[in-house]
Amino acid sequence: MKFHLAINLERMNPDTDMTAVRDHTLEMVKMAEAGGFDVVWAAEHHALEMTIAPNPFQILTWWGEHTSHIRLGVGVVNAAYWHPINLAGEAAFLDLTSSGRLEFGVGSGAYQREFDRMKPGLDQRDSWRYMQESLPVVQKLWEGDYA
């Protein structure tokens, strides 16, 4: 059996200081590693009241600097918000700096209100097309130069 933990930099009370939230998430990541968990996951969300998570690669890079063996999972990035070259590069760099600990996850998004802010005019139900288009490109970029 494998154990995974999804952690968001979220606060349930707007009076909670984000520094405390940040510190609490790092503490949970360290506890997960010490407790034998296999993967910790960070999500991508934009302009939601309860969380700050605009780039899971940044969060995971930070967690990776404070851990040694737990795998670092992107759960998930929204393909509609990323150019495939940026997505491939961010993922490859995190995998490099974490000594191969990246678990890559990409999806089509969860909340229409995020699409309204990030990709106005795109219906969340149609965003799978971005994923379908970008995944083969990302894979080719990881294999080498791709035009």
Predicted regions and their residues:
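Active-site nucleophile and cofactor-binding loops and adjacent substrate-binding regions
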Residues: 50, 74-82
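Conserved beta-strand edge residues that scaffold enzyme active sites
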Residues: 46, 77, 108-109
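N-terminal beta1-alpha1-beta2 module of alpha/beta enzyme domains
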Residues: 1-67, 71-72
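A short, small-residue-rich loop immediately preceding and capping a beta-strand
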Residues: 70-76, 103
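Flexible, glycine-rich active-site loops centered on histidine and acidic residues
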Residues: 2-19, 81-147
